[in-house]
């Protein structure tokens, strides 16, 4: 009897191992040993030694998974069930970057480009079309060279915002840069999508302040602004990341900041009625404040308890000047907020970037060297959506939104003010189009942890259903025809390409269909700039080598007309 049980357990173990092996093998799209050996040999021949191959029975997997997971910021895409790259390449020079692209092309691999790994939908780390793919991770290409005399800096694509800010501050205490607040976001992708932040009402987006770039295209050419031509240079600034080539470096314009700036984060929790009245007044004030002022709101529903608070509201303010000036401006324009001197802190610009960062325990810290930290400790699962608002939302409309927000303790909504320089820059100046007429942008966010992800009562599906409900509820109150969205807050719910079109093997009709299919999300992200972006894509990447689920396809019918030329 015992022998039979033992044999049964051994058989069961073998079956489970076989199932596990079969499941794991499905995570990596089929690739022959010959093909795998080809790309490995190619990389070695080009002296690219820093790469890791998907582990097989002959290769240990720790280094591969450590490298893969290091930069995945949204844990939804680090799950075991997600497809894995065949190879992860970490180039350490522009020559190695060029060689990496050529080796991927030689092996017919899809290419995923990863700078900081903050892609909201995991497009820098995952591919879902079933083809073998490679991740080219730029983490070693993170240099920042600042030239104060010319008020410019060359920033490699793998540098983070925090590394960039820190390098600028070491060179000058009266210069800064306009980009986002999360220091671990990669510069390559952030600027490719626009890059909105605390200085944007004064100086525009990160992409508005790019004066040159170095782009590795699908043929392995390293192109500067002159070589790529003005149409491509226009497209890569705000036209989305991962679809034009690989940004080796941006040349950015340094921006003047005073030695003293003012920062504050003021909580204003309360009833839905109280918060809705504050938000209603905020939307009338924040877009019209001086260009030097940035005032945003974040809201969430508190965890259920005995405290009679329905909504947590938090106002984050930044002013290019002293706190005396900041308080005077706000008390005149927004007295309902009740800002006091004790709420505000004077600091340097670089200290303000730390103050507003998502790094732990920085509220009372002045150790700005922490901005150089690349690894983000507080990773989570999340899903996000975005909107733009052109006309003020009524108190009743805000109340309706807060009723939905109240349902989900893990839900958040962030309101970012526009106006200022964003109002004056033309929507055709670069590919990012959301300018005149926008009062503010909205980011909807739901965030959960591992314990929540495995909750039988409320799994990740429940969280995603909630944010979709929130988004649908807001439809009457936001932009329409099209309902605009911010490409850096990528949302695959807006639509995806059913297949990844390769024009060289497709008909003109199917290629044209792909362009119209992509228009569904393309016009939400890029408005009237979409067709111009299609032409730029056809010119720089006619074979659609750089692509993902929500990319911009080339127009096959015009391939001959747009055969690459910088003229």
From Swiss-Prot:
Q: Which cofactor does it need?
A: FAD
| Pathway(s) per entry | Alkaloid biosynthesis; nicotine biosynthesis
Question: Disulfide bonds, which pairs?
Answer: 42-103
Print the keywords alphabetically: Alkaloid metabolism, Disulfide bond, FAD, Flavoprotein, Glycoprotein, Oxidoreductase, Signal, Vacuole
Q: Which residues form the FAD-binding PCMH-type domain?
A: 81-257
The identity of this protein, by name, is: Berberine bridge enzyme-like D-1
Does Signal show up as a keyword for this record? yes
Compartment(s): Vacuole
């Amino acid at each position: 009897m015992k022998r039979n049980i033992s044999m049964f357990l051994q058989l069961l173990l073998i079956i489970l191992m076989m199932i596990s092996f079969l499941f794991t093998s499905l995570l990596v799209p089929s690739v022959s040993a010959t093909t795998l050996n080809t790309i490995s040999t190619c990389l070695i021949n080009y002296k690219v030694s820093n790469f890791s191959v998907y582990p097989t029975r002959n290769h240990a997997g720790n280094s591969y998974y450590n490298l893969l997971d290091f930069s995945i910021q949204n844990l939804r895409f680090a799950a075991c069930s997600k497809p894995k790259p065949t190879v992860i390449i970490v180039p350490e020079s522009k020559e190695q970057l060029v060689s990496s692209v050529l080796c991927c092309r030689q092996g017919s691999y899809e290419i995923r480009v990863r700078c900081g790994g903050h892609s909201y939908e995991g497009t820098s780390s995952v591919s879902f079309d079933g083809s073998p793919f490679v991740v080219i991770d730029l983490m070693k290409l993170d240099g920042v060279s600042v030239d104060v005399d010319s008020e410019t800096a060359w920033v490699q694509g793998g540098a983070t915002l925090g590394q960039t800010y820190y390098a600028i501050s070491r060179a000058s205490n009266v210069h800064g840069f306009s980009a986002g607040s999360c220091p671990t976001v990669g510069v390559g992708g952030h600027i490719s999508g626009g890059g909105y932040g605390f200085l944007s009402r004064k100086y525009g987006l990160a992409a508005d302040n790019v004066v040159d770039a170095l782009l590795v295209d699908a043929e392995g050419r390293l192109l500067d602004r002159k070589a790529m031509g003005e149409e491509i240079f226009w497209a890569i600034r705000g036209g989305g990341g991962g679809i034009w080539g690989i940004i080796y470096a941006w040349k950015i314009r340094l921006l003047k900041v005073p030695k003293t700036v003012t920062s504050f984060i003021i909580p204003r929790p309360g009833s839905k009625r109280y918060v809705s009245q504050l938000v209603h007044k905020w939307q009338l004030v924040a877009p019209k404040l001086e260009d030097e002022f940035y005032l945003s709101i974040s809201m969430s529903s508190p965890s259920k308890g005995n405290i009679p608070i329905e909504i947590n509201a938090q106002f984050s303010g930044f002013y290019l000047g002293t706190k005396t000036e900041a308080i005077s401006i706000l008390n005149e324009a927004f007295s309902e907020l009740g800002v006091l001197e004790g709420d505000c802190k004077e600091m340097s610009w670089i200290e303000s970037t730390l103050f507003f960062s998502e790094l732990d325990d920085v509220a009372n810290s002045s150790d700005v060297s922490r901005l150089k930290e690349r690894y983000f400790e507080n990773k989570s699962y999340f899903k996000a959506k975005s909107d733009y608002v052109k006309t003020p939302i009524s108190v009743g409309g805000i109340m309706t939104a807060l009723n939905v927000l109240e349902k989900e303790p893990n839900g958040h909504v962030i309101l970012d003010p526009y106006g200022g320089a964003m109002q004056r820059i033309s929507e055709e100046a670069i590919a990012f189009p959301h300018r005149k007429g926008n009062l503010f942008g909205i980011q909807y966010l739901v965030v959960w942890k591992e314990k929540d992800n495995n909750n039988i009562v409320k799994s990740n599906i429940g969280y995603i259903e909630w944010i979709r409900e929130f988004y649908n509820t807001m439809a009457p109150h936001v932009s329409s025809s099209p309902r605009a969205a911010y490409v850096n807050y990528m949302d695959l719910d807006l639509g995806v390409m059913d297949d990844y079109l390769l024009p060289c093997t497709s008909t003109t009709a199917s290629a044209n269909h792909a362009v119209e299919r992509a228009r569904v999300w393309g016009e939400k992200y890029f408005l009237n700039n979409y067709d111009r972006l299609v032409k730029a894509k056809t010119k720089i990447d006619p074979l659609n080598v750089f692509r993902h689920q929500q990319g911009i396809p080339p127009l096959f019918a015009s391939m001959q007309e747009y055969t690459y030329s910088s003229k």
